[in-house]
Amino acid sequence: IGEVMGIFNKDTRPPFSGLKGRSPKELFHTLPTPCYILDESALQKNGQILAKVAQRTGCKILLAQKAFSNYNLYPSLSPYLAGTEASGLYEARLGAEEMPGKEVHVFCGAYREDEFSELLCYADHIVFNSPRQLERFGWLAKNAGKSIGLRINPECSTQEGHDIYDPCAPGSRLGTTRAQWDGQMTPRLVEMLDGIHFHTLCEQDADALELTLKAVENLFGDILPRMKWLNFGGGHHITRPGYDVPKLEQCI
């Protein structure tokens, strides 16, 4: 599977050109410390895998800067991605400045009123966490020409062993449940939306996505046809050897 998907392992990975063909182990004593050593050729290979998924499905794949914000390598990733995902003002600015010409998508659990106007200078898509948040900030974003989304909670847990990080765990305040939607989303707020967003996975395979999508369709299926886009969130371990790329593409 690794060869079919074009994924390197430790034996087939080419030398990192920045180290002139030598392994990092050979040069440890000459490197400044502490430091990170990144294999740019492997990074680009992963980018190619993502770009092929986007080409075959028509989806957009974004760089989650919360997970990787080494902006020196943004030029290496930019050709393969539609843009960046940010969790606040400074990540949005980073994506806009270091990956120019690409989209900037923002989701934040809580937006600061004193930062929101500046955030609008960088963001293309803004996702809100709750109907109340949407009501407070949505029209400011809409009038600025931004694409507006709402994060939903499909109430479908696919993770084991770390409930504290599970957005679908009981009591989670991340995303809007269907009950909250029915009780708080007025026709005026629904009309404001361009899309909906969910984020429930963490380094998981396409099986978990497939299960989550069934829950999304079950709870929000009547909403989906009225939306322009659906954001699958992060946590998809697409470049991992053995990841079921065909199933991912079928889900999309």
Task: Describe the predicted segments one by one.
Residues 43-46, 50:
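Alpha-helical packing segments of well-folded alpha/beta enzyme cores
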Residues 31-40, 59-63:
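A glycine-/small-polar-enriched, mobile loop at the entrance of the PLP active site in fold-type I
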Residues 213-252:
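Acidic, glycine-rich loop-and-beta core segments that form the ion-binding/anion-interacting portion
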Residues 19-22, 49, 61-68:
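N-terminal glycine-rich anion-binding loops that anchor highly charged ligand groups
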Residues 4-22:
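Acidic, low-complexity proline/glycine-rich segments
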Residues 59-229:
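Active-site-proximal beta-alpha core segment in soluble small-molecule metabolic enzymes
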Residues 19-36:
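Generic N-terminal amphipathic, Lys/Arg-enriched alpha-helix
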